[in-house]
């Protein structure tokens, strides 16, 4: 252990759990289950200027500054990852989140999971259209295309129509 993290011992000893003698200096702060990471999920940064939700299909692990969530089993047949990402990254949901989020600098917001998990999600007759457009956005991005504004515009209009705004 000393060979790998010994040079960080003083810094690690300053963690709250070490000061309270709940953990030894070389122990992880919080244990993690591999299965949580090794699955399809939506990932997003802890701090951001705007909503930046992305689908992870590569079983990625992340640092403390990246959070993720997955669709609970009882909702897997109701909502798709593509639909959720399309909704969450929309202009409407970006504004909606910023109204409720903690601002941490002039333009940055705190995307702490307790706030993100309270975001209301709807499903109506525009579901399939939003999902299809979101899939097109993802395909363009996978192909290295950066111009997705036409698709985002359509998604935003569908969401506004669904919400009556």
Q: Language-model features: where?
A:
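Non-catalytic DNA-recognition/assembly elements of restriction-modification systems
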Residues: 123-165
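Polybasic, glycine- and aromatic-enriched phosphate-binding surface used to engage nucleic acids
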Residues: 1-128
